[in-house]
Amino acid sequence: MANWPRCMLKHVIGGWILIGWSLGSMALAQNPRVLLETTKGDIEVELFEKEAPVTVANFLSYVKKGHYDGTIFHRVIDNFVVQGGGMTADMKEKPTSDPIENEAGNGLKNERMTLSMARTSAPHSATSQFYINLKYNRPLDRKYSQDNFGYCVFGKVIKGEEVVDQIAKVKTGRVKGNGDVPLEPITLKKAMILEGAAAAPVADTPKDSPQKDK
């Protein structure tokens, strides 16, 4: 490096300064985090606001309205997913806001412990229901999905993986016509924003929506 022209050294040093400043800015800009208090323990999730802005804003809106409080994890399939966010303890679906755009093309994968949106067979039908992947479910990624749309990943579990794994092992059966329902209800007692989400808007007036089914 001693033989490089001085002007080149200037650019290199300047580049390192710029990179260092950028990394510092990234450290300051933290992703939103949400705590899910369940009857099996607490689960903390980090939301990928940059990669899935519409989906994250939608999820935070439901959190702020208290939509998730008192809902159950109504679909549990070991080695696949834990799903919740839309059903009451008596297996009635809660009213939701309008469906959102499917952001599954954001490059994120349905890897173990990622947080994704459930939907019907219609690609842009996600509302409030979400699921946590219990393994890498590659067929749910846009690149490998049969419908060429896939299921949007918008966050990941950063604390409480053992709680998710515990939920995955509960006994399930058919309840009021629905399969894979925990026979002992697992309740999401409360969802609360921990940080980084103060600016998320509250969605419009809720309306009825079809049952979400991944």
Q: Residue ranges of each PLM-predicted region?
A:
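N-terminal secretory signal peptides that target proteins for export/translocation
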Residues: 1-10
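Bacterial N-terminal signal peptides
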Residues: 10-25
